[in-house]
């Protein structure tokens, strides 16, 4: 039973990856180009998440002070 669930999850992830390749047109690139693109994408998303994690609390507190929700 667990094997079937794992196989179904693998099939679903393969389908999502295939859709990702089609939507971004990565299926036309060579493997090394695809690796470069994916590396850059992961780096940019990682930096955006880190920046949001670091600076978002400061901005939220500034907004709350501006609207006098927090003293």
From Swiss-Prot:
Effect of residue 51 to I: In SPG90A; likely pathogenic; results in increased sphingolipid biosynthetic process due to impaired down-regulation of serine palmitoyltransferase (SPT) complex activity by ORMDL3
UniProt-recorded Gene Ontology molecular function terms: serine C-palmitoyltransferase activity
Lumenal compartment residues: 30-34
InterPro entries per record: Ser_palmitoyltrfase_ssu-like (IPR024512), SPT_small_subunit (IPR051900)
GO biological process: ceramide biosynthetic process; protein localization; sphingolipid biosynthetic process; sphingosine biosynthetic process
Gene Ontology CC, one term: serine palmitoyltransferase complex
Membrane topology per record: Multi-pass membrane protein
This protein's pathway: Lipid metabolism; sphingolipid metabolism
Locations listed in the record: Endoplasmic reticulum membrane
Cytoplasmic side: 1-12, 58-71
Site (Within the serine palmitoyltransferase (SPT) complex, defines the length of the acyl chain-binding pocket, determining the acyl-CoA substrate preference): 28
Major localization listed first in the record, in broad terms: endoplasmic reticulum
Alphabetical UniProt keywords: Disease variant, Endoplasmic reticulum, Hereditary spastic paraplegia, Lipid metabolism, Membrane, Neurodegeneration, Sphingolipid metabolism, Transmembrane, Transmembrane helix
Chain ranges passing through the membrane: 13-29, 35-57
Record note on what altering residue 28 to K does: Within the serine palmitoyltransferase (SPT) complex, leads to a strong decrease in SPT catalytic activity with L-serine and palmitoyl-CoA as substrates
Pfam families on file: SPT_ssu-like
Protein family according to the UniProt entry: Belongs to the SPTSS family. SPTSSA subfamily.
Disease: Spastic paraplegia 90A, autosomal dominant: A form of spastic paraplegia, a neurodegenerative disorder characterized by a slow, gradual, progressive weakness and spasticity of the lower limbs. Rate of progression and the severity of symptoms are quite variable. Initial symptoms may include difficulty with balance, weakness and stiffness in the legs, muscle spasms, and dragging the toes when walking. In some forms of the disorder, bladder symptoms (such as incontinence) may appear, or weakness and stiffness may spread to other parts of the body. Spastic paraplegia 90B, autosomal recessive: A form of spastic paraplegia, a neurodegenerative disorder characterized by a slow, gradual, progressive weakness and spasticity of the lower limbs. Rate of progression and the severity of symptoms are quite variable. Initial symptoms may include difficulty with balance, weakness and stiffness in the legs, muscle spasms, and dragging the toes when walking. In some forms of the disorder, bladder symptoms (such as incontinence) may appear, or weakness and stiffness may spread to other parts of the body.
Subunit structure: Component of the serine palmitoyltransferase (SPT) complex, which is composed of SPTLC1, SPTLC2 or SPTLC3 and SPTSSA or SPTSSB. The heterodimer consisting of SPTLC1 and SPTLC2/SPTLC3 forms the catalytic core of the enzyme, while SPTSSA or SPTSSB subunits determine substrate specificity. SPT also interacts with ORMDL proteins, especially ORMDL3, which negatively regulate SPT activity in the presence of ceramides. Interacts with MBOAT7; the interaction plays a role in MBOAT7 localization to mitochondria-associated membranes.
Primary role: Component of the serine palmitoyltransferase multisubunit enzyme (SPT) that catalyzes the initial and rate-limiting step in sphingolipid biosynthesis by condensing L-serine and activated acyl-CoA (most commonly palmitoyl-CoA) to form long-chain bases. The SPT complex is composed of SPTLC1, SPTLC2 or SPTLC3 and SPTSSA or SPTSSB. Within this complex, the heterodimer consisting of SPTLC1 and SPTLC2/SPTLC3 forms the catalytic core. Within the SPT complex, SPTSSA stimulates the catalytic activity and plays a role in substrate specificity, which depends upon the overall complex composition.
Name of this chain's protein: Serine palmitoyltransferase small subunit A
Primary gene name: SPTSSA
């Amino acid at each position: 039973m667990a094997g079937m669930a794992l196989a179904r999850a693998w099939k679903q992830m393969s389908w999502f990856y295939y859709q990702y390749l089609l939507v971004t047109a990565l299926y036309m690139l060579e493997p090394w180009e695809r690796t470069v693109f994916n590396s850059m994408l992961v780096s940019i998303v990682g930096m955006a998440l880190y920046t949001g994690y670091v600076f978002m609390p400061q901005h939220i507190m500034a907004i709350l002070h501006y609207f006098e929700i927090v003293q």
